[in-house]
Structures are given as C-alpha cells and as structure tokens.
Amino acid sequence: MARERTVEIREHEVPDPAGGPYGITAGPDGALWFTLVHSGLIARLAPGGEATTHRLDADSGPAIITAGADGALWFTEHRAHRIGRLTTEDGLTEFAPPTPQAGPYGLATGADGALWFTEASAGRIGRITAEGEIAEFGLPVPGAFPSMIAAGPDDAMWFTANQANAIGRMSFDGTAVLHELPTEAAAPVGLALGPDGALWFTEIGAGQIGRVTADGAISEFPLPDRTSRPHAIVARGDELWFTEWGANRVGRIDLDGRIDVHELPTPNSEPHGIAVGQDGALWVALENGALARVAPESHD
C-alpha cells in the first residue's frame, strides 16, 4: 500500500539571524552544531536548550561542519581559507592549507580517521589529521570546483565536482577518478552515503537527485520542480532527505526513486544544510535566520 507522506515542520530562532545559518551537523555531545556564514560564528543548540555561539573572524565564512573521529567539531572557513577545530576543552584551533586562496568548502571524516575536505577554488582535495598535518591532492580536470565530500562504502572519499559535471572518487593515496554525469550542466553539489551503499547527490543545475554506485554506475531522478535547485542531502533510515534552496522546500527520495516535497513555513527561507538530530528529526539550516525541525509522520 502506498504510504501517506506528511511532515510536521517547526522553525527555531537562532542567535544573530542575519548571520545566515548554513551548514549543520549532529555533534558527539547530542547537540546540533551549525555555522553562521555571514557573521563568522559557530553555534551549538542543545536539546531543549538555547543556542550558544563561538566567534571566529567576522569575514571567515564558516561553511560546512562535521564531527571528527577525535570527538571535536571541524569546519571549513571558506573565505578565510582555513580549517577549524573546536572543542569545549581545547577551544578553537585553525589550520591553513598549503595552497593559498584554496577556498575550502566540503568536509567529511574518512575511514582512516582523518578529515577530508574540498578546495573549491584550488580544484584540489585536502586531508588533515587530528594533529593538523595537511596533504593536498590534485584532480585530473582543471577548474572542477569540488564541492561536497563524503566517505564511501569502499575505503575511499567521494565528492561532487560541480564545474566538471562529475562525481569523483579519491582513494586514500590521493588517486582520483571522475565519473561524468549523463545530464549536461547538472552542477552536482550535495552528497551523502545512502543506506543501500551507493552515493546519492543533488544536481543543483538540473533539478535532479542522482545515485552512483561504487563501480561508477549512475542513475538520475528528476524532481517535480526542475528549477528547485536542490542543495544538500542526508540519509535517514531507508530514505534520503534534501533541501530545495531555490524553491523553499525540503524533499525526500526513497531507494526506488519515489519523491515527495514539503513547503517550509517562511517564504524565501533559503534552506541549505540538513542533518539528522539526536531526536531522529531532520534539522535544516535556513539562511534567512532560523533552523527548521522536520519531523516525518509516515503512516502505512
């Protein structure tokens, strides 16, 4: 029987709403951590509590944030060209990649325990250890603009190559392979490992969700609104959820490619990052100054 797909959506205020909530992740402490890209803040929202903030340089442009294997929160400073590490015990530490003006953006923990990041402006992939040692690896195509990155099922890192119109795979020795997308100018951005062992991604330029297996086989699923500009994606249970930055919606896709989308309460809220919280709900960073809690209510 077809499932009735409904959700409950509530918005939560954040400190400095003009700061622009952008990236979001569930921390090892059970709290939600998110970036405020326009004001240079890292914020923490504990369950049932109020948000607290940690200040960076105002123009640092914190973008993507994730939990490291060392229990710290790591994030990219896209405009300051740094990688940041934050703990309640040690405070803030920042590291600059060897390549100047690299534009670090995507960030994910690898199976090797290191943090891997994209250098969007430099067209490279970087690796940083918990001690701050950084290595950089080139890509086979110049100007690829690598965006999001995720650990794959195969002891490798996978990434979206936005301007190369491809999905990339990088082994831990720095060898990169690109898989070209069937749709021209698809401009992939978001990326997540799915429950089926494949990588799922958003095509912001084509209005589609894509899927790539470890051997490079690609499928694409058109969204109901091809102009919706899907941005970030995350796995939850046996489905994946994504943000539609250009259409003020969140959506989900199941492993058979069935899609449903849901309007956000505030018009033009600019949904970007999305994460699964400790409470099992989806939490979305809205660049217009709030977080949205999306609680699926599925009935068979």
UniProtKB/Swiss-Prot annotation:
It comes from the Bacteria. The keyword Ligase does not apply. The keyword Lyase applies. Belongs to the Vgb family. Its EC number is 4.2.99.-. Its cofactor is Mg(2+). GO terms for cellular component: outer membrane-bounded periplasmic space. Signal peptide: none annotated. Pfam families: Vgb_lyase. This is Virginiamycin B lyase. It is an enzyme of class 4 (lyase). One of its GO terms (molecular function) is carbon-oxygen lyase activity. Inactivates the type B streptogramin antibiotics by linearizing the lactone ring at the ester linkage, generating a free phenylglycine carboxylate and converting the threonyl moiety into 2-amino-butenoic acid. It comes from Saccharopolyspora erythraea (strain ATCC 11635 / DSM 40517 / JCM 4748 / NBRC 13426 / NCIMB 8594 / NRRL 2338). Keywords: Antibiotic resistance, Lyase, Magnesium, Metal-binding. The active site is at residue 272. One of its GO terms (biological process) is antibiotic catabolic process. The gene is vgb. Monomer. Mg(2+) binds at residues 270, 287. Substrate binds at residue 231.
